[in-house]
Regions:
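N-terminal [4Fe-4S]-dependent radical SAM core
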Residues: 3-40, 85
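A short, flexible beta-alpha/helix-coil linker loop
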Residues: 23-24, 57-62, 158-159
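Canonical Radical SAM [4Fe-4S] cluster-binding loop centered on the CxxxCxxC motif
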Residues: 40-71
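Short acidic donor-binding/metal-coordinating loop in glycosyltransferase active sites
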Residues: 43, 96-97
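Radical SAM/AdoMet-radical enzyme domain recognition
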Residues: 73, 77-93, 102-183
Length: 183
């Protein structure tokens, strides 16, 4: 009770709070046009590995497994274009989980993004982060043509990688992905 009375007295004497030196800038800040230049699309809420350290917990992120629909991704790209102002270069990162588990939607969204470039005077830079398990010749050809960057996940030499990045059944993934990465 004594502490509450003391706090009330300090508040009444205007000595409890310091002056907000940033308050005068709030009006200008709120009036600024917000420009969005990049999006990270959580395209796959699922994964085909069971990495020991993964924050996503096999792609589940403490939730049920799911894949982003084309419609949701399309709305995201529309949002990016609508809120990019005069910025020409826009970035979209396909992330997960494992984005290649939703490959058709990735391809469709890249095609949709490309269709927006000329009419809106925009240029998309696409990036994809993958563990490499699902890579094949068709996917690699598309990635080489359409992606500005491809992030390949590997944890070091075979013993380390296989211990840290196993399949759900426990077997290592190194021997499957390294030849694909080398290709």
């Amino acid at each position: 009770r004594e502490a509450v009375e003391e706090i009330l007295e300090l508040a009444q004497d205007n000595v409890l709070f310091t002056e907000d030196i940033y308050e005068k800038y709030i009006g200008n800040f709120k009036q600024r046009q917000t420009v969005v230049k990049a999006l990270c699309l959580h395209i796959a809420h699922d994964c085909n590995l069971a990495c020991q350290y993964c924050f996503a917990e096999e792609g589940e992120y403490h939730g049920r497994r799911a894949l982003m629909s084309f419609e949701v991704g399309k709305k995201a790209l529309d949002f990016l274009v609508a809120n990019s102002g005069s910025r020409v270069n826009l970035e979209v990162d396909f992330f997960g989980g494992e984005p290649l588990m939703n490959w058709q939607v990735v391809k469709d969204l890249v095609a949709y993004g490309r269709s927006l470039e000329e009419p809106h005077n925009k240029k998309f830079r696409f990036t994809l982060t993958t563990n490499g398990v699902l890579l094949n010749d068709e996917i690699m050809e598309f990635l080489n043509k359409e992606m500005s960057n491809v992030v390949l996940s590997i944890d070091g030499r075979k013993e380390v990688h296989d211990r840290m990045r196993p399949f759900r059944g426990g077997q290592g993934s190194y021997d499957l992905i390294v030849p694909k990465f080398q290709k």
